[in-house]
UniProtKB/Swiss-Prot annotation:
Record family assignment: Belongs to the MG067/MG068/MG395 family.
Residues with a covalently attached lipid (S-diacylglycerol cysteine): C23
Name this protein carries in UniProt: Uncharacterized lipoprotein MG067
UniProt keyword annotation of Cell membrane present: yes
Entry's localization field: Cell membrane
InterPro entries, A to Z: Mycoplasma_peptidase_DUF31, Uncharacterised_MG067
């Protein structure tokens, strides 16, 4: 039996004082919110596919994520950040070669045909969420824990599914899939599809900047550049992290499930990505002052009590996973093949939710006014994580210190499962990635105080940091302070994002195009 837990990202606890009183923000303690309870429906619109409104493209871009091992399963949210392959290929107009045709060609031609059927989607999410991905076939160093040790068997990922609230679009007979009511095939449901193979880690936001954090006994702490030769006795040195990561999800188009994901979900996501500005314009790089008066839009899949159904499309055991081509041998077939089933759950379900008020239909939210919080790390709804000593995270059994700037979203209490949701501004640009909410534990029942946290992905230079931490960083394209960023992987794999960097005249995305 699997014990089910859901992550909101980080639940931020503050013992001993009440939020928005005149107490220091240093009192907040981040804790991964692995909870065996689920959230209740909030005031936002849910279980409705957005059409012809501000959220429509965000929906197309966004997916629910599900990792399962021997003991637990975890839910989160992710969004398409990049891809590799021919996104114009319409499987509805193509016929993939039959096995009889394939068997008649040479081994070399067979390899080319099979490799041509691979499309790779890159899905952005939170670092703390992909801590649940433990895959022996992952890229180094992610195929082992942070100490170079193999993962215990009961922690290894057994299955991975992508999800979306949508129509199942299944033509099989109901009795073949254990359906109770045939009409459910025509209804929107929370659809999860198991991919043919386990994903890999394309990028993990660990140690991305040229700075380290030195933890002191009085919790003040300080940052230094890595090149510093100074000795700091009675301190513990932690590398930095940003709560941002990218999954590599291979889709083999001769596999029915992978082909369905590509055709029905990824192709619309690619179209939305391009309509939102493609690589040149989708990633905001906004001066801090412009954050204050903006509006923020959030769409994700928090786990809540839900009266909808869940449809799980498991892997077909008949699919032959060939180990004989250079591409296929680098991926691991899913160890646990899920059953195909239509179920009604009473223990919570990922729920499509976006921050449009159900009653007033007001869309989006503002940053919180934090004038009442007396801490120099905060100002006008922005937060400097570098100066908050307790914001740490264990990824693959190694502890890291959070750095960077973030947004504090007012009236945003998306519960577990919303980790990794993209936060857009009113210009429909991606500004940050949602990773958790603030919790007040002084009441004894861990009351959510309706404030959500995002990690800004790209920043301008600023001189307002009081902690000797980097004043700018860019987790997508890199800058003078960022030594590990996603575009490095994109260059290595020659993805869509890298091709755009190569041809773009937009200097803000080409800073590192000629660098390793």
């Amino acid at each position: 039996m699997l014990y089910r837990f859901w992550k909101t990202g980080l639940a931020i606890f503050m013992p001993g004082c009440i939020l928005l009183s005149s107490c220091s923000f240093r009192s907040y303690i981040p804790t991964p919110s692995l909870r065996n309870t689920v959230g209740n429906h909030n005031s936002y619109v849910n279980n409705t596919v957005p059409k012809n409104n501000f959220y429509e493209k965000f929906y197309d871009l966004t997916f629910a994520l599900n990792f399962t091992n021997q003991k637990t399963q975890e839910f989160g949210t992710g969004w398409l950040i990049d891809w590799k392959g021919d996104e114009t290929k319409d499987l509805n107009t193509l016929t993939i070669a039959s096995s009889s045709i394939i068997s008649s060609v040479s081994n070399h031609s067979l390899k080319e045909k099979q490799d041509d059927k691979l499309f790779i989607a890159y899905i952005a999410t939170n670092l703390h969420l992909i801590d649940g991905l433990k895959n022996d076939h992952d890229y180094q160093p992610y195929n082992k824990d942070g100490n170079g040790l193999s993962f215990p068997f009961d922690q290894k990922t057994q299955s991975f599914l992508l999800g979306r609230f949508a129509n199942p679009k299944i033509n099989s007979k109901p009795e073949e899939m254990n359906y109770q009511v045939q009409t459910r095939l025509k209804q929107d449901a929370m659809v999860f599809i198991q991919t043919s193979t386990l994903p890999k880690t394309a990028y993990a936001g660990i140690d991305p900047i040229n700075f380290d954090y030195h933890e002191t006994s009085d919790e003040s702490g300080f940052w230094t550049k890595k090149q510093s030769t100074a000795n700091f006795p009675r301190t513990r040195t932690l590398k930095s992290y940003a709560d941002f990561a990218v999954l590599e999800v291979p889709l083999f188009l001769d596999n029915a499930n992978d082909a369905k994901i590509y055709q029905e979900w990824i192709r619309p996501a690619v179209q939305a990505y391009k309509e939102l500005g493609d690589v040149e314009n989708i990633f905001a790089k906004t001066p801090y002052a412009e954050y204050i008066n903006n509006t923020y839009y959030l769409l994700g899949y928090p786990v809540t009590n839900n009266n909808k159904y869940q449809f799980i499309l498991g892997q077909d055991e008949k699919w032959k996973f060939s180990q004989q081509t250079s591409v296929l041998k680098h991926y691991q077939k899913q160890p646990l093949q899920q059953r195909t089933v239509y179920v009604e759950r009473d223990d919570g379900l990922p729920t499509l939710t976006f921050n449009e008020d159900k009653l007033t239909h007001v869309q989006g939210t503002d940053l919180i006014n934090v004038d009442q919080i007396t801490d120099t790390n905060l100002g006008n709804g922005l937060i400097n994580y570098a100066g908050l000593s307790r914001f740490t995270l264990s990824y693959h059994n190694v502890e890291y210190k959070l750095f960077g700037y973030g947004t504090i979203l007012n009236n945003t209490n998306f519960p577990g499962g919303s980790s990794g949701s993209a936060v857009f501004n009113k210009e429909k640009q991606l500004t940050s990635i949602y990773f958790g909410s603030l919790i007040n534990v002084t009441t004894g029942n861990n009351r959510n105080v309706n404030l959500g946290l995002g990690q800004i992905l790209r920043t301008y230079n600023t001189n307002n940091s009081k902690h000797s931490a980097p004043s700018s960083y860019d987790l997508i394209f890199g800058d003078k302070n960022t030594i590990k960023f996603y575009a490095q992987f994109a260059k290595e794999k020659q993805t869509h994002l890298w091709n755009k960097i190569q041809t773009s005249v937009n200097s803000s995305i080409s800073f590192y195009k000629d660098k390793k």
